[in-house]
Amino acid sequence: MVKKVLVINGMERTLVLEGTETLAEVLRDRLLLTGCKIGCGQGHCGACNVIMDGKVTRSCITRISKVRDYARIETIEGIGTLENLHPLQAAWVAHGCAQCGFCSPGFIMSAKVLLENNPSPTREEVRDWFNKNRNLCRCTGYKPLIDAVMDAAKVLRGEMSKEDLMFKPTDNKILGTTYARPSGIAKVTGSWDFGADEIKKMPEDTLQIALVQAEVSHALIKGIDTSEAENMPGVYKVITYKDVPGKNRITGLITFPTNKGDGWDRPILCDEKVFQYGDAIA
């Protein structure tokens, strides 16, 4: 065990921790600062980026034993609020950068360090900075992220206000406009919880689901024997296709015009056939 005194979002915290814990685990598990996300867990995606002593830090690979006492750590929860967004958070919302929103906190923390050290970056410098700090996004194509940083820089330089960033409908119509995504503010402030975040905040006796997925790309199912699993300690129930009420089918997965089925071809839980690697079985 190690004793650490850390200054997290301006507040001094004294913690007794396992030396093998990562900074991300301390933030998420001990302090419930779940705005810090864990994506790859190997320091390659930037979702876990926080600021430590003024530098972008990949918290998922930073052992707490290597963090100095009184290190100053900033997370997404510490740079703005739902009512008073940081200019980067406001720009993220305005440009639609927070789509799924999982990568947004890591990007914003990286961008904050960039603008603190370079108030007038070029677009190329923004791209290079995100590459350097391993920030990855699967939703946006990156252009809106760079646009957001450039506009946030203007706000910080006093060339425009946060209010100037936001779309304002003039005819009460928002369809086809840049009207802000309703979930955007929650996602850029770290208050939008994903499944891995929700579980940190649930009662200790909350049941958890472990998904059994197909490990082959195609197969015919002759039977599913759940007896051994049901007898394992801690198992409350094993759910298979037999437990699905009504029609064990999901639509919307196959929507190509060439599809010959009725749109209800895929099971919720596999019953007769495995269609692809990773299909849910139980």
Regions found by a protein language model. Give the residues of each.
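Signature of N-terminal electron-transfer/Fe-S-associated modules in redox systems
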Residues: 1-169, 173-174, 189
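Flexible, low-hydrophobicity surface segments
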Residues: 154-282
